[in-house]
């Protein structure tokens, strides 16, 4: 970071997150729990803090109570040293409207920029999963002479309608020649025709230039008051917009496999996929990089516990992330992420799923390819994620790709005989990880099969059922 530049960071955290419903029915999108112990906003804030930017304001609006509480309980800075992370809701300082867009959110909060009097303003989104050293981006911004710089990541061409698309100047690859927000199609890169440069929603501005642009935008009638749709094109048209290639960002402790990882988790399917990215032995995104930690609120729950259940059934978790306070009592968890204080009962199975805080899985229940929000109780013998039509009939959301989603505290009806039979048919199955490990060892494979039979028998299901 240039030592003679004062930097203020602004985190845009007012998003409603309609595409993440029902996970956002009771909270703002940046406040959605993620990866067992975190909330989505922790990634943006950790990246800023690790970049040594310690004057941060978080602009909130939509159902922000849990998000504001998380920030106040987790992100306590040393104000005696002039550092702070302040959650700032819409205040109607300019007119009587709430935030009308991301640019309007900053415009209505210009007092924060005036009070901090920075040279540089870093603006970031609050709902992406990645690691990034913003100091490296600021360094390029200052050296290039640009007034605005956009961080860019390569994406497949078929995703152009989901992002702001950047075309670079042919003579100066650090300069933006054109910027189009979510076009129906776009040409590919010269170096790789199958990809395009997408805006990451992270920006660096000269502070005075940003303030001027926001005033101009506020006076326009033909604007959506959007950072990507209106403010960045303003700088592009003036020839003052630069681009920062995310692949140049160098994070301590990163691997070739995860150093350019970036996920927009704005949909249920992408949110689910991001969790599945975490659980392999060599994950696409490594949560365990201690040189660039992702910070969050420390749990007061005790360590996780794996114990035998009824009938001497073995409690185990394979290829999974298990947070504090989890108790797996004779159940099997595979390829899943379990948040704090989850309980998994005797002979139950949780496969390829995401369970948030205090979810309870009853005896002999089966959960498959599901996301279950906080405080849901799954009764004994229930089957979730095995029959999409049955799930929809009970009021659960099922995505086109087959992910079943239960909202916070949603009631799960007691299973009927057909549902109990459906779950019972899955209790004998040997976990995929054990199948792979015992493939060439018949005796071990037979032993694993007997474990499955014992689990089923513990809840009164025979191998012939």
Curated annotation (Swiss-Prot):
One MF annotation (Gene Ontology) recorded for this entry: ATP binding
GO biological process assignments: glycogen biosynthetic process
Keywords, sorted A to Z: ATP-binding, Carbohydrate metabolism, Glycogen biosynthesis, Glycogen metabolism, Nucleotide-binding, Nucleotidyltransferase, Transferase
Enzyme class: transferase
Pathway in which the depicted protein is active: Glycan biosynthesis; glycogen biosynthesis
InterPro entries to which the protein is assigned, alphabetical: ADP-Glc_PPase, ADP_Glu_pyroP_CS, GlgC_bac, GlmU/GlgC-like_hexapep, NTP_transferase_dom, Nucleotide-diphossugar_trans, Trimer_LpxA-like_sf
Reactions mediated catalytically: alpha-D-glucose 1-phosphate + ATP + H(+) = ADP-alpha-D-glucose + diphosphate
Membrane-spanning intervals of the chain: none
Chain residues that bind alpha-D-glucose 1-phosphate: 164, 181-182, 199
EC number(s) per entry: 2.7.7.27
Function: Involved in the biosynthesis of ADP-glucose, a building block required for the elongation reactions to produce glycogen. Catalyzes the reaction between ATP and alpha-D-glucose 1-phosphate (G1P) to produce pyrophosphate and ADP-Glc.
Family note: Belongs to the bacterial/plant glucose-1-phosphate adenylyltransferase family.
Quaternary structure and partners: Homotetramer.
HAMAP family to which the protein is assigned, alphabetical: GlgC
UniProt-recorded name of the protein: Glucose-1-phosphate adenylyltransferase
Upper classification of the organism: Bacteria, Bacillati, Actinomycetota, Actinomycetes, Micrococcales
Gene name as annotated: glgC
